């Protein structure tokens, strides 16, 4: 059965299908999503939600905030997650004692994450790393809802952490995740790009916020055994990307 307009050649047909595949695949997405949920192994969040590295008179604090990425899902200990990796890099760069804290929950969407904003934890933070948006895209939230929810969340974080630089992790290219079969991967990739663009716009509209891309090469070594969450290698890459951004901004206080 023809699924593209008559009168187009093979190359044009391929381009047409790539543009329209997410819409064509939407009816299959719920069934495939259920299959993935049953198939993907359940793993644990990392231990060590607080910790300290480095030495020196200077004191810095990094907070990992948001969803399963920052909760360290599929990582043994937060020493190896983005929280610990950032703390170690900050300690080395600034010859400081750096503490980390984690305010994150697996499965959190932007509205759920609002309940994780804890002024007692965030008030003295120097750097806050935020991962949010994948679950909003996965759970079928509308773009208008996500824009509203993530804007409210960013404002709450900035208010609770008056001196912190806040870094958002971009929504990764979900179409490349090993755990997602096609056409579900194409649907998720399409939604992920839309939600990523919203996050980018909301970051640009606020002071003290920056963002790192999550669209680098994603080989098998970048994923945990579930094929969905980041491995220790990818957590380290996130931390390296943040440190590159910090090179371009005023030194942490």
Where is each model-derived feature located?
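N-terminal secretory targeting modules
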Residues: 1-63, 247-253
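Extracellular glycan-modifying ectodomains
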Residues: 2-13, 112-116, 135, 174
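Short charge-dense sequence patches
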Residues: 30-43, 60-67, 97-108, 145-154, ...
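Conserved SGNH/GDSL esterase-like catalytic core that processes O-acyl groups on lipids
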Residues: 61-63, 69-149
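Alpha-helical cap/lid subdomain in secreted, periplasmic
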Residues: 115-253
């Amino acid at each position: 059965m023809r699924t593209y307009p008559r009168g187009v050649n093979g190359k044009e047909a391929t381009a047409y299908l790539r543009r329209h595949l997410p819409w064509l695949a939407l009816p299959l997405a719920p069934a495939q999503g259920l299959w993935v949920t049953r198939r993907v192994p359940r793993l644990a969040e990392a231990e060590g939600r607080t910790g300290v590295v480095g030495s020196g008179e200077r004191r810095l604090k990094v907070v990992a905030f948001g969803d399963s990425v920052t909760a360290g899902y599929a990582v043994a200990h937060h020493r190896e997650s983005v929280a610990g990796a950032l703390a170690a890099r900050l300690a080395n760069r600034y010859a400081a004692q750096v503490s980390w804290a984690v305010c994150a929950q697996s499965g959190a969407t932007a509205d759920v994450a609002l309940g994780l904003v804890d002024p007692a934890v965030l008030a003295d933070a120097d750097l806050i790393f935020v991962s949010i948006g994948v679950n909003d895209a996965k759970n079928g939230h509308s773009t208008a809802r996500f824009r509203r929810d993530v804007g409210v969340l960013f404002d709450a974080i900035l208010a609770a952490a008056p001196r912190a630089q806040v870094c958002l992790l971009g929504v990764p290219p979900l179409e490349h995740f090993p755990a997602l079969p096609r056409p579900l991967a194409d649907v998720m990739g399409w939604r992920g790009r839309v939600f990523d663009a919203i996050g980018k716009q909301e970051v640009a509209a606020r002071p003290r916020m920056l963002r790192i891309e999550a669209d680098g090469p994603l080989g098998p070594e970048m994923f945990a055994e579930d094929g969905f969450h980041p491995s220790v290698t990818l957590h380290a890459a996130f931390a390296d990307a943040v440190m590159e951004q910090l090179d371009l901004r005023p030194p942490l206080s």
